[in-house]
């Protein structure tokens, strides 16, 4: 279902963050013909490369995704990002991607369901917070579908969900320093429990 939601087409610059054992890597590669993966775990890279033999053109970047310059990687075009993000560092990865929104066409991520709910929360909602504000200032956030624990081996203790993030046109994004906006939002939501 993730691959159907992404609907990759040949010629698009598709980047998978953290392919792990390659559960969605091969279906993406089959559809797109070429795929770049960013993987930190050096031990997984040969397995992914071996599995991709004869399926399509696979480029592997061995790096921490938080150090990857997506704007440079786009080479003047736009990227489509996909990934089953590690739940413990999903927010830093999302904020890092926002820094490169101008080089990204869309993002499809599987995350903990509660994180997706916070990302898409409307103002006034109990779960509306810093993550909601920062993402919605830059992207359209569309929760797509829930993924039950049984879809994984071993099954996690939490439900997951897939979300689509589509960066807004530059004219619709705030014309202000993102660092300053983030500081104000962090301060505002840091104070809300004290009132």
Report residues per predicted region.
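Pseudouridine synthase
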Residues: 188-195
């Amino acid at each position: 279902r993730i691959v159907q939601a992404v609907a990759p087409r040949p010629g698009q610059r598709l980047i998978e963050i953290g392919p792990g054992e390659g559960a969605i890597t091969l279906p993406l590669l089959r559809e797109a013909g070429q795929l770049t993966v960013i993987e930190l775990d050096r031990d997984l890279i040969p397995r992914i490369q071996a599995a991709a033999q004869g399926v399509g053109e696979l480029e592997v970047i061995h790096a921490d995704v938080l150090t990857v310059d997506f704007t440079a990687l786009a080479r003047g075009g736009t990227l489509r990002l996909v990934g089953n993000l590690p739940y413990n560092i999903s927010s830093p990865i999302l904020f890092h991607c926002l820094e490169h929104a101008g080089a990204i066409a869309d993002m499809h991520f599987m995350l903990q369901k509660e994180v997706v709910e916070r990302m898409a929360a409307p103002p006034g909602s109990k779960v509306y917070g810093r993550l909601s504000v920062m993402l919605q200032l830059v992207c359209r956030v569309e929760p797509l579908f829930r993924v039950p624990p049984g879809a994984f081996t071993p099954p996690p203790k939490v439900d997951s969900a897939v979300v689509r993030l589509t960066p807004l046109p530059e004219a619709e994004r705030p014309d202000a320093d993102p660092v300053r906006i983030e500081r104000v939002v962090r301060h505002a939501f840091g104070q809300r429990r004290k009132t």
